[in-house]
Curated annotation (Swiss-Prot):
Pfam families: Ank_2, Oxysterol_BP. One of its GO terms (molecular function) is lipid binding. Keywords: ANK repeat, Coiled coil, Endosome, Lipid transport, Lipid-binding, Phosphoprotein, Repeat, Transport. Residues 235-334 form the PH domain. This is Oxysterol-binding protein-related protein 1. Residues 1-237 are annotated as: Interaction with RAB7A. ANK repeats lie at residues 47-76, 80-109, 175-204. Residues 502-530, 795-821 are annotated as: Disordered. It is found in: Late endosome. The gene is Osbpl1a.
Amino acid sequence: MNTEAEQQLLHHARNGNAEEVRKLLAAMARMEVVADIDCKGRSKSNLGWTPLHLACYFGHKQVVEDLLKAGAKVNMLNDMGDTPLHRAAFTGRKELVLLLLEYDADSTVVNGSGQTAKEATHDKEIRNMLEAVERTQQRKLEELLLGAAREGRTAEVSALLSRPNPPDVNCSDQLGNTPLHCAAYRAHKQCVLKLLRSGADPSLKNKNDQKPLDLAQGAEMKHILVGNKVVHKALKRYEGPLWKSSRFFGWKLFWVVLEHGVLSWYRKQPDAVHNSYRQGCKHLTQAVCTVKPTDSCLFSIRCFDDTVHCFRVPKNSVQQSREKWLEAIEEHSAYSTHYCSQDQVTDDEEEDVVSAMDLKESLARAQTCQQRLDREIYNFLKMIKECDVAKDMLPSFLQKADIVSEASRETCVALNDCLNLFTKQEGVRNFKLEQEQEKNKILSEALETLATEHHELERSLVEGSPPVSILSEEEFYDALSGSESEGSLTCLEAVTAHSFEENEVPGSSGKHRMSEGKDCGGGDALSNGIKKHRTSLPSPMFSRNDFSIWSILRKCIGMELSKITMPVIFNEPLSFLQRLTEYMEHTYLIHKASSLSDPVERMQCVAAFAVSAVASQWERTGKPFNPLLGETYELVRDDLGFRLISEQVSHHPPISAFHAEGLNNDFIFHGSIYPKLKFWGKSVEAEPKGTITLELLDHNEAYTWTNPTCCVHNIIVGKLWIEQYGNVEIINHKTGDKCVLNFKPCGLFGKELHKVEGYIQDKSKKKLCALYGKWTECLYSVDPATFDAYKKNDKKNTEEKKNSKQTSSSEESDEMPVPDSESVFIIPGSVLLWRIAPRPPNSAQMYNFTSFAMVLNEVDKEMESVIPKTDCRLRPDIRAMENGEIDLASEEKKRLEEKQRAARKNRSKSEEDWKTRWFHQGPNPYSGAQDWIYSGSYWDRNYFNLPDIY
């Protein structure tokens, strides 16, 4: 687009330079200038306004006419939600209002202040004019609705009733017939069902005192209208100002909205229009209204959970207003109760569902008639070919023609019967589908309401509860309260940095410590022959505060979560293959294990490595991009002493395989992960199916384990936070030693948040060592007897504190445990196995990445010439998101997904199976479980016949 031409168009439209506007429009028509006639201004004087808005506001009639003739959108909205008609009406320009109406301006559009053009004007004549136009437009829509109902055009009826300002579903013609009358006497079943679901009243009478039932044609139509069929009308939105009572703040005025069986209240009406800043809501299932005879303003609502909400109507038109509210609440309560309790199909509904046997018999009859028709036609044609036509043969031909004609009629009747059965079946299925969709919507809104209330209850319980153990931690309260996490993160960095200097892992070399948070520098400079890596991303992340995961998931209830396409704003600029690579951040633990001679000490290091593998997930609520089938990723880190290759080996189910090896041939680390997702209402759980295998080649040992379950909480309301829980069993297949780690769920008050505890046992289950810590911070080892004694004493102290609190509230402050400098209490005699490095200062702006994660998508020209074209670093949607180009990332993500679907369809047509390149399926050599094994030859760099996936 030509930005300069658009700025000129905006300037001339604002100043009324009609001649200049015509020149620009003519140049645009001749394609000499490419500009948008509906462009929006970006300067202070025209911000968010189109040329038509400006010309209407400043009263330049000729410019308005020229713009409309050139195709300017007459109902375009500016940033305040105003149409040009709003601006012309507001400034009292009658001629422009008439001109806009001639070009079909919509007078019913509501702006950001909740006003139509009629309500925005101060000119009485314009108001009367717009009211007359609205009545005319409304009557035209009503006539269209009546005509569509008479002719049985169900799609047109649905479209008219789905408009932002639909016609009255109970409008009438000159005879007093409503659309329901018209559809009923023409026996248009689908139209009748649609009208009833849209609120048509079957009790209304025409001028001859007839109801739709009196005009209905056929028993089936009468059956529907009598009401044997469960058809509930769609309720209209009802809203207005009400005073609401609060326990602490008394009476307060709100704008209250009733919609889809949910009562919501807002501070102001514009908030309700945009459904923002909702102050509260209540689901009306089984709700009951009560009034006090002595107070004509007051009424209360008792909800299904026995909570009572008191409201008071404004004093103007008290009785009438309260009656309307009570009627509306009763209707919405009945509507919500019906859809939340309707589980069984009624007998009448079952009768309408045509059985498979009926359909089969109908089709068989039609096929028999068709075969007879084919046979008679064949005989007729054969007779013509074999006989010379003579006068005496004409009667025979005529008789045969009659037989063929009769067979044709029978075939048509049979096929028509079959078609009618299928049509009836389709109608019933559509009706049931709409009912289930409505029920689904009601239940999802109920779930959101209950989750909000449950969240508030959790907050009140947590805020009112003191810590119950020295092992409890304060940052859990932040996770539930929704406060910012920067403070706790900074505190944690200070603690870990201080402790890291004092508790350095014995025997770890400087080379190994490079992975633990030291500044890696940036650019391509070399330090001691080791390449320096970048310390930040090209662009910070976009805020997700205005987006809700629940708004996406509520539309996908019942779907497999792995197949749901999420908006790119919820992603982080890494593929899941790159996220898997973060297992290798603390590779120094594997090197250390290889250097130790004691098998128990080796198991300690392996256990620490297994815990450290999930540490980077804390506060990483962004979803990695789903890898495309055939996508690969490689990482070579000379400074950390390993190289890794991974491949997406399956799309449904999504399976990622990886293989890493030490550069000094001291270890092999491999496995395959299938993240199985479950939606639990308030949380999403990811269970990483698949076996992880670590081979220490110098000791001829192999260890296998599975990762813990990851859960993202507060999907519906509150701040997202992550926890890991479940048992992880690490087995040494050579010695029989076993390490069982318990990743503890946090519980209600967060006492166990992030905790990891476990024991190393020999093959006779004798405890050799105890391990404890937090997967977000550190892991220690200690003598098992000492650990058991500490646990017993800690449990005793906890019970004493509870009893102390119950006997004397005055001693509560003295009994509160003093926070230690360590968020994990260190048992005397413990040995530090692993401590997480502090994240970089800019981590919060960089998707909460660790220093290791920052470099995973880094690419330079030298690397680009070496890696295969299937590598994640070359994936355009991830690259665009990393650069801050969200719109481009979304477009590229959609393009790649469509390309993958097209490739899958082509393989299906050609019956060609997908073949993985670098991995093959087979049993794990140690556990025997099905696994994906590295086939070799990747590092030979012979990348031929690779799929085109980007």
